[in-house]
Amino acid sequence: MKPLHYTASALALGLALMGNAQAVTTIPFWHSMEGELGKEVDSLAQRFNAENPDYKIVPTYKGNYEQNLSAGIAAFRTGNAPAILQVYEVGTATMMASKAIKPVYDVFKEAGIQFDESQFVPTVSGYYSDSKTGHLLSQPFNSSTPVLYYNKDAFKKAGLDPEQPPKTWQDLADYSAKLKASGIKCGYASGWQGWIQLENFSAWNGLPFASKNNGFDGTDAVLEFNKPEQVKHIAMLEEMNKKGDFSYVGRKDESTEKFYNGDCAMTTASSGSLANIREYAKFNYGVGMMPYDADAKDAPQNAIIGGASLWVMQGKDKETYTGVAKFLDFLAKPENAAEWHQKTGYLPITKAAYDLTREQGFYEKNPGADTATRQMLNKPPLPFTKGLRLGNMPQIRVIVDEELESVWTGKKTPQQALDTAVERGNQLLRRFEKSTKS
């Protein structure tokens, strides 16, 4: 009979080996997807975890995009950052300039996982790539463009063709007046006013938002959205607001709820709002392209993306990064990227996901579901319509919101408000430029 202490030692060793064999690498993933979108994020994570028992993706909703970005950077400074942080597109320059990130192409390379960067739609991947090397710094995830949602039932009641949404902003103003006259509470409201009414208005109508090709060619860019075309557009919305044909309902996505609960007959909002509209709208609705300015030469041009990408944070161990690479690879697989696109309304981020969705007949069964993609690919992007890469852009958006609100409340003229927004925004750009050179 073996001595008892040998048996106990063997038992302890066995338990330790079992523990190691069953060890699971936990990978925190902080995001800003709520409602139906949050459910889809959870579903993707659960499926990955089931297929990869050595890893556990733990998605956590950390508030809206601004709140999540702030929480992620603050957590990095205290050594408690998540492995994956979802950051909205205007936070790209900030993340690039920070020392908090590990480029995704490095993550894949070190994990020994083949990663084809060319699989992503160029208009999307170009937004998140290093302008010097061309390599992806973050992985595209929930990319979107603004679209026009409209209530077909309300259109019929107002004597409008439910299959013909307004094509121009001038048409939209006319439609909204008719909808109001028919008894609808709100003819038109807009979500994300800075992104839609200035950033995308500029690109869609072939206008620069800032110099240096919207910042892609250097941090010394200056804002240029106070030109006559943009001022005229804001003045049109101001006039609609005075008549009650445009309702300002908030800075974020508040207009989506106003739309699906039947208060507003039309809204311009993210294509990613489709999941919630599909779930909650109790009426027939349509999806149209963003209106363009009837007076703009060669409009419409191409939409620029919104949404967010996934950034990998510094300071994690090798096993965590291997799990991160596996998860990002999982998200990019055609069947997963196509499902995310189809269920949420976000763009198909890879060519294969778009092809698979088309082959499955999804667009035929769901008219309008490809609207965001068609807008993005409407024309080859001009150097100043491929996106924005401006430092401190989240803070600049706040300034734009404040100044536009001063128009809606009658405190400033459109020219005064946009001039002030440009002046205040340029101060932030110079501050960012200085910080990148120090």
UniProtKB/Swiss-Prot annotation:
One of its GO terms (biological process) is transmembrane transport. Sn-glycerol 3-phosphate binds at residues 65, 89, 144, 270, 307, 346, 397. The keyword Signal applies. Part of the ABC transporter complex UgpBAEC involved in sn-glycerol-3-phosphate (G3P) import. Binds G3P. Belongs to the bacterial solute-binding protein 1 family. This is sn-glycerol-3-phosphate-binding periplasmic protein UgpB. PANTHER family: ARABINOSE-BINDING PROTEIN-RELATED, SN-GLYCEROL-3-PHOSPHATE-BINDING PERIPLASMIC PROTEIN UGPB. NCBIfam families: PRK10974.1. It comes from Shigella flexneri serotype 5b (strain 8401). The complex is composed of two ATP-binding proteins (UgpC), two transmembrane proteins (UgpA and UgpE) and a solute-binding protein (UgpB). One of its GO terms (cellular component) is outer membrane-bounded periplasmic space. Its main location: periplasm. It comes from the Bacteria. Residues 1-23 form the signal peptide. Keywords: Periplasm, Signal, Transport. Disulfide bonds: none annotated. It is found in: Periplasm. PROSITE patterns: SBP_BACTERIAL_1. CDD domains: PBP2_UgpB (cd14748).
